[in-house]
Amino acid sequence: MGRQVNEREIVLAVLMEITENGAYSHKILGEVLSKYQYLEKKERAFITRVTEGTLEHLIEIDYILDQFSKVKVKKMKPVIRNILRSGVYQLKYMDSVPDHAVCSEAVKLAVRKGFSGLKGYVNGVLRSVARGLDTLDYPQEGIEALSIQYSIPTWILRLWEKSYGEEVTRTMAADFLKERPVTIR
């Protein structure tokens, strides 16, 4: 009998395909949801929310990780980096998932992926994030601050600022993270 499918493992696989192999998020997520259509609606919604949310807030999440980890995001092993990214997303944006569950599941996932030697690191970073998230200082001014706040690359923000000015750029950036209306076809 096969091992039960774990939603966080699926999220990790999708994030790895996108961040390490350059897959298009909408395509790979669609394929994965089609492959696992037998999962309950709640599980599929979790996979979608964590994957899309992690990607939408990637720059901010990487900033947060860099504040709480001695190893910078760019130097982390790709699997560990993406486990931590999805964990930070859950800690910051999903109140329905308890902090201890996020940490515990991330550690289990690291072990399942062959990184049992880094389980203490994963646990330590995520527990530090959970404790310190509310007191974290973000940059307040400049393009870097906008980039982190809205998770938009600085090069795009610079182009917008050059073309549209600072105020329009700020408005456009804020609109990217607004909740999108539901569309039914």
Can you say where each PLM-predicted feature lies in the sequence?
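Class I Rossmann-like S-adenosyl-L-methionine
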Residues: M1-R185
